[in-house]
Amino acid sequence: MGVPLFELTMNDRTISQQGTGKISILSPADLEIAEVTADPGVARTGASTDFSRMTPLPKGTRATVIGREGEWIRLDYGAWIQASEVQIVKDAVPARSIIRSARSRQVSGWTEVLFPLETPVPVTVQEGERTFTLTLYNTTAQTDIIRLDDDPVISRLAWQQISPLQVQYTFNLKSAQQWGYKLRYDGTTLVLSLKHPPANTSMMPVSPAKPLSGIKILIDAGHGGPQDSGAVSPVGIREKTVTLIVSKLVQEELVNRGANVVMTRVEDVDLDLPPRVEMIQKEEPAIAISIHYNALPDNGDAINTKGVGAFWFHPQAHSLAMFLHNYLVAKLNRPSYGVFWNNLAMTRPAVAPSVLMELGFTINPEEFEWIVNPTEQKKLAQAIAQGVTEWFASVK
């Protein structure tokens, strides 16, 4: 059809502007099929990293390309993805599927729900209050049977065809606290994995001396190494130094309570965000906590800005973020900076409730004195460990 021409008319005056792109009408036979090659593919609401993230697409997902903008591709279910994260599949059939069944099975620490499909279709998930909802796009149900045995996580499953090409599965859960999930394709079978609660959150008795016995906790000391010092105080002390000191103290306190603690770093070394995230994915801890200290831009109000902040992304991490924030503010008599939903690398892992704690502002002169005080650092570590302990007790 060619290049579009836009015209605006007002008060008998017309302004014309030629578009920067072309408009084409493609035959359905000419539509391209994109297959996700990244693990996972980052789906967004628009054609830029400025747009919000949607549920990541498992490697192998296929969808029809319905638009392009620069280095971005629009998929038929509504999301955009960078062209570098997909490959165009030649002579592929339209990415549509029939689903006839589903079944569950238990593996070590997880319940897997298998959805046999004809092609790997796009998916989204949503965590609710005692519910986990999975939506399959470009899918039509011809379902006769679903096997779902008694399970540590799932109490019941309901499903419905919510539109001609969308099937939605709602898992009713036995606990309000969710512990993590994973999505992958085995061939054309979608595998949804839901993590079981830590053994220590069951009704089994726990040793008062070791209340976190059997629980794996990942502690991330923010920043590190010569390339990433983090925030710098007025006297030159770097955030990376304090986060490591406090993280090691937290590790000691958690171990004393029986926890199995995994540290992303124990020395002043460079460690980019992707390896930290990969460690969470590999270790599959019960929870992950990233330790940081805050700062402001050069024009920020350093004198009047201070306090403890907590950040979460997935709903499963909200309870932990809120509990730790409130506990530290009350226990240590610290000001509150607030609790925030935030799309951060260290809050995005879905395999475990993952939070990032900003424990104070290094640029605030008064708070800085508290931050670097060894006695206060010890009290802070004890409060974090005790807060974690009491949170686990609260979600039984």
PLM feature segments, named:
Residues 55-58, 240-248, 252-256, 278, ...:
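Solvent-exposed, polar/charged alpha-helical surfaces in well-ordered, non-transmembrane soluble domains
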Residues 1-217, 256, 293:
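Short linear recognition/processing motifs and adjacent strand/loop elements at protein termini
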Residues 196-279, 283-285, 297-300, 304-306:
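Active-site histidine-acidic residue metal-binding/catalytic motifs
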Residues 223-226, 237, 267-271, 293-298, ...:
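Solvent-exposed loop/turn segments at secondary-structure junctions
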Residues 47, 51, 237-248, 267-274, ...:
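Soluble non-cytosolic domains of exported or imported proteins
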Residues 283, 287-290, 294-298, 309-312, ...:
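Active-site-adjacent mobile loop/cap segments within catalytic or ligand-binding domains
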Residues 285-291, 303-335, 339, 370:
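C-terminal structured domain segments across diverse proteins
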